[in-house]
Amino acid sequence: MGHEEELSPEQVDLKVSPLMGSLKRTWNDFCATSSIHGLRYTRDEDTNRIVHFVWLLISLVMFICAVVMARTFYIDFRSNPTRMNVESDNTPVNTLYFPPVTICPDVLFNMQKSEAFLQTLQLPQGTNQSVILRKLHIFYGFMLDDEKYSEQDTSLMESLLSLNNLTLQQLVEHLRWNCDEILYRCRFNGQIRDCLELFQLSKTFFGHCCSFNLRQTGLNFTAERAVGGLKYGLSVILRYKDDSYDPVQSYSFGVKLLIQESDAFPSAHSSSKFIAFNSEVFAAIRPQETFCSPAVKALSIEDRNCVFRNEFKMRYFKNYVYPNCELNCRVTNMVKFCNCHTYFFDFNRTTDRICTFKDIPCLVDNFANIISRKRSTQCYCPLTCEHLDYDVQISDFPLKLNMPVGDQFYSGINKNDGILHVFINSFGYRRLRHDLLSNMVTLVSNLGSAFSLFVGMSMLSVVEIMYYFSVILRKNYVLECEARKKMLHKGPKFAWPKANDSHSKHQKSVFIIHKM
């Protein structure tokens, strides 16, 4: 490429401005020497204007295609920047806590305790202990909408509270099960242990239950580590300590087993299984952990489409996991529609009123709104970036009393007992890494591939464009201005018009320029 140090008069077009002339000259130089495919043919002197136009059109179409593909790459990068990779299928399970185990009696209250406590209370006029016991099923109105409860029933239970100066929570404390009334014998990690050392009374969506290794406000987190295999799991003999328990009348003969993350509130979101009495049940657990790479942690919430536990605050629950957010929405709707929330959601984090029997009709009537069946009552609950999932497989067998076993754990079992074994079925577990689908290097590589495929551009081509339309453009502009100045300084020939020109009222100068 050669650039003239001085332009001849024939190379200067006085019909356009110096800037336009220098731009045109720079464009011609760029097309003649550019590495971009097709541009040189748009200024080929050996072809006509039709060929020039065709090549210009082809180059323009190819450039548009490159831009469209590059935009597609960028949109994909922004809309779905992450992916899941299996980091390991054999991570040692002893790096995890043992999965939280919650055991809930399938009947809300210990009837033997309830009868004894009601004998100490002043009962409403015209009623007796048997009537009150039959009305205890009204507590299901705090949880479900299966039944409509009459105003007479709710008023009767309200009067029971007021006559004895009791709150609903105090009444529940005297009626509920204790853990030693459900759990007869426990074994963990191969050793028989006191059940009350392992299990603590917890609040759940199903009322009061007994939980092991659960992190909940008011509980001491035992932080027991996991070990693979049946021998090192948790075994429990289940036996109701309630002489008044009638499985026919209660329509139940067993307990609920709930397994979820240690920070999650036990609820319908948990992995729930029914453990029947007069059987031996084996619950084999396979954990799966999802965690994030440092690159994903550095992304914004909008880009990774998930949150960490300290990034999303809730009113009624301390620790953020997705099930807790759904329940937080449920409690919020309770307060919104009924101005109270149920007793098992009381963690002393707010001053909201606790629902009593008089609020049950409101809770039942607004059940669809409370559990967010309608879009208008749904809440925003982002997914958690890091979490543990538990796949629970159940195997159950009839309980054999006369089977010769040398294990002291089985001594003294009764025919109506239930035996539960919860264990991790492998010494290793799967870890999934939430990683970047592509980083900035990959994005730049994809963009470069698009432009290279269609127009043959590279980063060097970008530098070339910048060079031509800065350095070379300035040089051409200076040459253009100098050439025009020299043409004017050579003194063009001109003539004055005659003084008696009748076609003009004012004297005008008419320049007649002759080419030199």
Swiss-Prot record:
For this UniProt record, the keywords arranged alphabetically read as follows: Glycoprotein, Ion channel, Ion transport, Membrane, Sodium, Sodium channel, Sodium transport, Transmembrane, Transmembrane helix, Transport
Query: What is the official name of this protein in its record?
Result: Sodium channel protein Nach
Q: Which residues are glycosylated?
A: N128, N165, N220, N348
Extracellular topological domain: 71-452
* GO CC annotations, alphabetized: plasma membrane
| Cytoplasmic face residues | 1-49, 474-516
Compartments, as annotated in UniProt: Membrane
Q: What Gene3D superfamilies does its record include?
A: Acid-sensing ion channels like domains, YojJ-like
The way this protein sits in the membrane is described as: Multi-pass membrane protein
Membrane-spanning ranges: 50-70, 453-473
Q: What protein family is recorded?
A: Belongs to the amiloride-sensitive sodium channel (TC 1.A.6) family.
Query: Which InterPro entries does this UniProt record tie to the protein?
Result: ENaC (IPR001873), ENaC_CS (IPR020903)
**Protein role:** Part of a complex that plays a role in tracheal liquid clearance. Probable role in sodium transport.
- Which biological process, per GO, is one annotated for this protein? liquid clearance, open tracheal system
Molecular function GO terms recorded: ligand-gated sodium channel activity
